[in-house]
Amino acid sequence: MSREEDEKLLFPSFAFPAECFPEAATSGGEQKKARQRRRRKVKPEAAAALAGESGGDEQAKKRRLSDEQARFLEMSFKKERKLETPRKVQLAAELGLDAKQVAVWFQNRRARHKSKLMEEEFAKLRSAHDAVVLQNCHLETELLKLKERLADVEEEKAKLAAVAAATTGGGGGGGGGSSSPTSSSFSTVTYHPALAGQFGVEAAAEEADLTYMSEYAYNSYMLELAAAGYCGGVYDQFS
């Protein structure tokens, strides 16, 4: 077999060209055209969605309030926060809006008003909290100062107590020699014969001891005797 025959057996398309099969060629072309038509054809759902989006944009534009309508609704909201159904219908008729649109506007406005009140209340609470924290810091600082002063006072008190204890212990030994004025007012004096002879004292009293009494002790002694009723007897003895 020659080379051409081998190729015809292996590749029949070369042996039988497209002109030999006209029906197959036309059917393939129709399939391609049908595919192109399917690609170009838009689904009804997509078309409806596009139409809905365009209609939604138009409705959104219609729902937008003018400045005058917004001011009128604000004035109405200041007077009454929540509207009844007849009042909503009346406002909608006056403004040329839908009653549902007016109800939604008032609902959103109440939510914004409540949020604003909460923010103001939070600001007040935050300010009060900061003031309390600052006052607490001042009190803690004052407490530390008072603790330092108390420690200084306790230290000074301990020093004074130590000094007082040392003073009391040192003076205890020397305090034993002290005596009352009355007991120290009397002292024994030895009799001197030369002095006694000058004043004419009898020889019998030479061996006696003389007792010296101070003026203060003498006055006290005389007062005690007067209180006991012995003044007359003493003067009688000396008279």
Curated annotation (Swiss-Prot):
Which Pfam families does the entry mention?
Homeodomain
Q: What is the superkingdom listed in this entry's lineage?
A: Eukaryota
**Residues annotated as region Disordered?**
25-65
A GO CC annotation recorded here is:
nucleus
**Keywords in alphabetical order:** Coiled coil, DNA-binding, Homeobox, Nucleus, Transcription, Transcription regulation
Q: Which SMART domains does the UniProt record give?
A: HOX
> What does this protein do, in the record's words?
Probable transcription factor.
Q: What is this protein called?
A: Homeobox-leucine zipper protein HOX12
The organism named in the record is: Oryza sativa subsp. japonica (Rice)
Which gene is the coding source of this polypeptide chain? HOX12
